[in-house]
């Protein structure tokens, strides 16, 4: 039976989705399930790995049932995932020994500070392309081994496995056939040497993490395993593509040439520049990371990671109850000509690139008696654009490339106000693709390439379609005045920090 579709699992920070794509790269159907966010202490964020699995299984079942898809028509399954989020589970039982520690969580901050104080940052940066920060997986693993009784000894005996969410999903979907990850996810652990393309024994020794816990690292487009018999009506489907969410979006945006840049506006905000086969070291607080491994060759990227972006709208809705629906933010922001001088710095769990300060917290500046709800909401949306400008300026400096356009995706960029303001504050056109679900599309493309469903990257690039081009309309003087106000607000936020 001729395959017609590729299935993608997009396992995100707040929900899991299953999306089915046809050969043209169009969405045939999708399903989504949210799951609980666990906040044991301020600054800590956890997920129940079993609930993540349940949410994934539910979306797969719902999608195939509702669309009445014959599983024999599915060529392959691709996985994209929230990166850095860490799961440790029992090799024999498959049960996690602790909640997953989410990428946003700061609970391993003290471990990071010790590593910095002991002078390890330069070595870690040189080998991994990353900074020592609680954002990445390594210190999360160390925290779990320290806080679960007997975990260190069990890990040393080979009884425990570590993985990012992709590894956890493949292990379970395949019935334990494969303990694997891909280069893009491995590069986010703070344990992987991006130059030798292997787990770094010195870094493992530094954190006392047994190598036996770690997954095998493979290309981002290859057959890792097949789904276990009880899935998909006893028809095994090849699991053939894996990429961390931001690298998957870069692939889905067809940013295949050095210098091409995309920004994903999701829970966080993430800008990636493709740098080809060269690992460009940042001098401005950006990360050097692996974009993907394809056809036996690794390609690199520069990344600026912003911790809080679209989730600020969720905070307006659920925390402050200023809006009933996330979509209400666009209409409210449009009610006022500007933010009334208000700036929101959403450092709820610290500031990411290019500042990397985990000890600061969110702040609001410029409030007056005339500040209304619309000003507050507008300031929250504008904060996403200002943070992106911070990263873009650093990226241009590192790469020596003046950008001519930005390809944007993710749920928040469907907000026309945000898209237009982003183009204004950057001073370059923002291109929103016809299909904004580029993260899942990238995972589908990687899986489809592995099994011959798509023939080449050239075919994929030809399928990229434009929905709308947002040209900058703001005068340069006004743009720079607004941005200077943002920089002043950030400086004040950095001056007020917590222990």
UniProtKB/Swiss-Prot annotation:
Key enzyme in the regulation of glycerol uptake and metabolism. Catalyzes the phosphorylation of glycerol to yield sn-glycerol 3-phosphate. Belongs to the FGGY kinase family. Glycerol binds at residues 83-84, 135, 245-246. It catalyses: glycerol + ATP = sn-glycerol 3-phosphate + ADP + H(+). Signal peptide: none annotated. CDD domains: FGGY_EcGK_like (cd07786). The gene is glpK. One of its GO terms (biological process) is glycerol metabolic process. Pathway: Polyol metabolism; glycerol degradation via glycerol kinase pathway; sn-glycerol 3-phosphate from glycerol: step 1/1. Its EC number is 2.7.1.30. Gene3D superfamilies: 3.30.420.40. ATP binds at residues 13-15, 267, 310, 314, 411. It comes from Stenotrophomonas maltophilia (strain K279a). Keywords: ATP-binding, Glycerol metabolism, Kinase, Nucleotide-binding, Transferase. It comes from the Bacteria. GO terms for molecular function: ATP binding; glycerol kinase activity. Pfam families: FGGY_C, FGGY_N. This is Glycerol kinase. GO terms for cellular component: cytosol.
């Amino acid at each position: 039976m001729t395959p017609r579709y590729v299935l993608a699992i997009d396992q995100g920070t707040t929900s899991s989705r299953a999306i089915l794509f046809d050969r043209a790269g169009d969405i045939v159907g999708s399903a989504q399930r949210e799951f609980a966010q666990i906040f044991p202490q301020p600054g800590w964020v956890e997920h129940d790995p079993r609930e993540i699995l349940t949410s994934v299984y539910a979306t797969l079942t719902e999608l195939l049932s509702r669309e009445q898809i014959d599983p024999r028509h599915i060529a392959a399954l691709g996985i994209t995932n929230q990166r850095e989020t860490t799961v440790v589970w029992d090799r024999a039982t498959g049960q996690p020994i602790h909640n997953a520690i989410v990428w946003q969580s700061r609970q391993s901050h003290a471990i990071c500070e010790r590593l910095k104080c002991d002078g390890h940052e330069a070595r870690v940066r040189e080998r991994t392309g990353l900074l020592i920060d609680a954002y990445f997986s390594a210190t999360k693993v160390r925290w779990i081994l320290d806080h679960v009784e007997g975990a260190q000894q069990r890990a040393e005996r080979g009884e425990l496995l570590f993985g990012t969410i992709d590894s956890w999903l493949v292990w379970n979907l395949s019935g334990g056939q494969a303990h694997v990850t891909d280069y893009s996810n491995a590069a986010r652990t703070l344990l992987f040497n991006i130059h030798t393309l292997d787990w770094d024994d010195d870094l493992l020794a530094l954190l006392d993490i047994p190598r036996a816990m770690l997954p095998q690292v493979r290309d981002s487009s290859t057959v890792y395993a097949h789904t276990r018999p009880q899935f998909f009506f006893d028809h095994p489907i090849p699991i053939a593509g894996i990429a961390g969410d931001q690298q998957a979006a870069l692939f889905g945006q067809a940013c295949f040439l050095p210098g091409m840049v995309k920004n994903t506006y999701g829970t966080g905000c993430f800008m990636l520049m493709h740098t080809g086969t060269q690992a460009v070291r940042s001098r401005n607080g950006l990360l050097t990371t692996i974009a993907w491994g394809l056809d036996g060759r690794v390609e690199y990227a520069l990344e600026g990671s912003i911790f809080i972006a679209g989730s600020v709208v969720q905070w307006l809705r659920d925390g402050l109850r200023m809006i009933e629906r996330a979509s209400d933010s666009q209409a409210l922001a449009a009610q006022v000509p500007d933010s009334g001088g208000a700036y929101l710095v959403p450092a709820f769990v610290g500031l990411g690139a290019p500042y990397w300060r985990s000890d600061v917290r969110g702040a609001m500046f410029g409030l007056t008696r005339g500040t209304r709800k619309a000003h507050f909401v507008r300031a929250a949306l504008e904060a996403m654009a200002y943070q992106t400008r911070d990263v873009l300026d650093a990226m241009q400096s590192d790469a020596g490339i003046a950008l001519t356009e930005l390809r944007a995706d993710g749920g928040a960029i469907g907000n026309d106000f945000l898209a237009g303001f982003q183009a204004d504050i950057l001073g370059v056109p923002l291109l929103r693709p016809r299909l904004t679900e580029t993260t899942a599309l990238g995972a589908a493309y990687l899986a489809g390439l592995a099994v011959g469903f798509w023939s080449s990257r050239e075919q994929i690039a030809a399928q990229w379609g434009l929905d709308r081009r947002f040209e900058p309309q703001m005068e340069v003087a006004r743009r720079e005045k607004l941005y200077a106000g943002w920089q002043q607000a950030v400086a004040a936020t950095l001056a007020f920090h917590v222990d």
